[in-house]
Amino acid sequence: MLGPVLRLVVKAGKERKLRNFYPNLYRDEIAAPPEGVGVAEAVDAEGHFLAVGYYDPRSRVPFRAFRFDPGPLNRAFFQGRFARALRRRQGLGESHRLVHGEADGLPGLVVDRFGEVLVLQVRSRGMEALREVWLPALLEVVAPKGVYERSDVEARRQEGLPERVGVVYGEVPEVLEVEEDGLRFPIPLALAQKTGYYLDQRENRRLFEAMVRPGERVLDVYSYVGGFALRAARKGAYALAVDKDLEALGVLDQAALRLGLRVDIRHGEALPTLRGLEGPFHHVLLDPPTLVKRPEELPAMKRHLVDLVREALRLLAEEGFLWLSSCSYHLRLEDLLEVARRAAADLGRRLRVHRVTYQPEDHPWSLHIPESLYLKTLVLQDDPL
């Protein structure tokens, strides 16, 4: 049944977190930690029920709540969670995020869907321990042809868990064909970044393609497999993609060849490559990897971002658009605005905020879990007077 076998007492005052549906409890928030590891019931100082979750003192987050009503963490529970996630993604096409961790009530689990293949990541000890319960439930609800695991992320290493990479169910091609709005990307799953494709930028890519005009010049920095660059080329614009990942640039090259499109490619680190380029470009896109994983890293990373944005603005055409994204929770929208102001001041450029976007609906943002909002994009336009 996997009903609660442990009882965890929460410190007075800290029970408000669970009552407000925040799922994580840290060591200093637990008054009476249970002996052992396993499914646990969290109660307040007076013994009133708060949540059911998984307790493991070796985890950086010892208790993660799975449900806020009494009950087991059995196959039926996980079937219900997966069925709800599937229902909420109806109409989003064949490529989307099916499970987005805590925001879908499944802490430590990410599942991306690419047609009939699922690619998953297990990021927490609790979800790893419950694998034999939730994996059959996932297969029953979604009925994929194959499931591939890419549990080789930093969050897993922080949990002290070994990496797991490979096929866990059915048949999965070595090279997965990922489709998005008529573009197809041949992704080698064993070599790809994360789960293979950055689905969270889908709506930004659509917005970008709608804004690009034939004959414009586009610079796609941190391009990965060229989701933006290929859309620019499809609209008749000149596109230059920059990335340090040779495998990703190879995928971009193959995708462009198949479509009969031209995208120029530069292999290298972003900042030195930008310094060696000449403009102008009508669109410059900066989508760096997670730059800030801990709050203490924020000042140094903001300085680095100012350098990047300054070079991007140097290359930006008059009335051109700068797209600045951050997938770091600790780098807030206010930080991005500050970075842009500092870089613009250095060059004497006047900018206006054309648009601010966030992650799409298949990467849900829970009001009660601030960390579930991670992707922010500033679309800035050069605004001379």
Swiss-Prot record:
Active-site residues, as the UniProt record annotates them: 327 (nucleophile)
Keywords linked to the UniProt accession: Cytoplasm, Methyltransferase, S-adenosyl-L-methionine, Transferase
Recorded phenotype for the gene knockout or disruption: Lack of methylation of cytosine at position 1942 (m5C1942) of 23S rRNA.
Location within or outside the cell: Cytoplasm
Coiled-coil stretches: none
Any one Gene Ontology BP term: methylation
InterPro entries found in the cross-reference section: PUA-like_sf, PUA_sf, RlmI-like_PUA, SAM-dep_methyl-trfase, SAM-dependent_MTases_sf
Single GO MF annotation: RNA binding
Limits of the PUA domain: 5-79
Lineage top rank: taxon: Bacteria
Main location: cytoplasm
Its biological purpose: Specifically methylates the cytosine at position 1942 (m5C1942) of 23S rRNA.
Subunit structure and binding partners: Monomer (in vitro).
This protein's name: Ribosomal RNA large subunit methyltransferase I
Lineage: Bacteria, Thermotogati, Deinococcota, Deinococci, Thermales
